[in-house]
Regions:
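Short, small-residue-biased leader/transition segments that mark boundaries at the very start
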Residues: 1-7
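Active-site metal-coordination/substrate-binding segment of hydrolases
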Residues: 84-150, 397, 403-404, 408
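Acidic/histidine-rich catalytic neighborhood of metal-dependent amide-processing enzymes
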Residues: 124-198, 257, 264-265
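Midchain, well-structured core segments that form catalytic/ion-binding scaffolds
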Residues: 170-318
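Active-site beta-strand termini and strand-to-loop segments that position acidic
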Residues: 76-80, 203, 375-378
Length: 423
């Protein structure tokens, strides 16, 4: 690797130049190397092995924490002592779909017109590699005078966050003061995000011939009653859901390029519940003996997972607990921190010097690995989601990250990590 290049257009002062270890070409090549590794909801262990070898070249120790034979996390540290800043990105990517739909091969990094094309460039191998390079350059320049940076590269974020949950269960977050998730954020700094739950309600009746329906119990009718009552419960909640700990309006207004009204703001910042799937019956001349309804619920601190579980059980008791059950296959908590916590303060102060625009501060309507890392953040860990890339490019055909944004965020991260730990 090159270690003697300091690009003048990226360097802000002499200290920055001293912290630059890798050339721009090297930084792009490193991203290309991990884009090449096809981690479509599997095989993250190959990225772990690549990063472990890379970090070892710069005397940075790391550990592979296996989920199974093909899926794993990587943990690496530089510095020592408190405070501990955890930095995290996931190694899995979503399916690339039909490769013929892509202008360029999805698992070969293509550098064209100032854009780096490839699956995962934005979501989120670009952010992950920017963090890794920032660690390397801080280590090589001996710029870190206080505290510890702990890299947590995770598996399975796009599915059930089991990589992050494993690291949390094994104590890798127990001593952290701050956490940065490097998801693509379009130059928005997120101080909090919503949670997400999947709930499946099943109605079980009794089959009978449609000519003799009185001999059966119609599961569809029972489930329709449940859905209608839950709809009324949700309406009642939204009528009172007027004060929000999470303010997602700045994010939405930036993306939509317009102001939004009060009704919209209640949706974006508040509790959201959607009945997205309804299935019942097998054939037209039979009384259906089974029906299912699936809900996606976006939770907030005021209406968390415990509230949702209690709500579903309450409606089931009222409609018919002899016929209805609820299963919750996935549940990720909302995560909140102070809007002006030290990480957010450093990001909003430092990043504009590199990205040449003010940083909007907002809550995020999606979820991240922080749900598994921090839960509801009862320990009040300083928290930020901030990373290179436009969030609208995530999961898209011809996914790309702007080259200048990827390179700039390496410098942003170096300065933010250092400033946070020193103060």
């Amino acid at each position: 690797w090159s270690s003697d290049v300091c690009s003048s257009d990226l360097t802000k002062n002499e200290e920055d130049c001293e912290m630059t270890v890798l050339s721009e070409q090297d930084k792009i090549r490193l991203l290309a190397d991990i884009v090449k590794i096809q981690t479509e909801n599997n095989h993250e262990i190959e990225v772990c092995e690549y990063l472990k070898d890379l970090l070892s070249q710069y005397d940075i120790d790391s550990k592979i924490v296996k989920v199974n034979d093909s899926r794993a996390n990587l943990v690496a540290e530089i510095g020592s002592g408190a405070p501990v800043l955890a930095i995290s990105g996931h190694m899995d990517v979503v399916d690339a779909g039909d490769h013929d739909d892509w202008t360029f091969p999805p698992f070969e990094l293509t550098d064209k017109d100032g854009k780096l094309f490839g699956r995962g460039t934005t979501d989120m191998k670009g952010g992950l590699m920017a963090m890794v390079i920032a660690m390397i350059e801080l280590k090589q320049s001996n710029a870190l005078k206080q505290g510890t940076i702990r890299l947590l590269a995770t598996s399975g974020e796009e599915t059930e966050q089991y990589g992050a949950q494993l690291l949390a269960d094994e104590g890798y977050l127990d001593d952290v003061s701050g956490l940065i998730i490097g998801e693509p954020t379009s130059n928005i700094a997120y101080y909090a995000h919503k949670g997400s739950m999947s709930c499946v309600v099943t109605a079980k009746g009794k089959a009978a011939h449609s000519s003799m329906p009185h001999l059966g119990t119609n599961a569809v009718d029972i489930l329709v009653d449940f859905v209608n009552e839950m709809k009324q419960e949700y309406k009642n909640i939204k009528e009172h859901d007027k004060v929000h700990e999470l303010d997602a309006v700045p994010m939405i207004e930036k993306h939509l390029h317009r102001k939004i009204g009060e009704e919209e703001s209640h949706i974006y910042s508040g509790f959201v519940m959607l009945n997205s799937v309804f299935n019942g019956g097998k054939q037209v001349n039979s009384v259906p003996h089974k029906a299912t309804a699936k809900y996606n619920v976006r939770t907030v601190p005021e209406y968390d997972s415990t509230f949702v579980k209690d709500l579903f059980e309450k409606v089931i008791r009222h409609v018919g607990e002899d016929y209805l059950t609820v299963d919750i296959p996935s549940s990720h908590d909302p995560v909140a921190s102070d809007r002006d916590n030290p990480l957010i303060q450093n990001i909003t102060r430092i990043a504009p010097n590199y990205v040449h625009e003010d940083i909007v501060v907002s809550a995020l309507i999606g979820t991240t690995d922080a749900s598994s890392f921090l839960g509801t953040n009862e320990n009040n860990v300083d928290f930020a989601v901030f990373g290179p890339g436009e969030s609208i490019m995530a999961h898209q055909v011809d996914e790309f990250i702007r080259k200048d944004m990827y390179l700039s965020y390496i410098d942003v991260y170096k300065d933010v990590f250092k400033a946070y730990l020193e103060k």
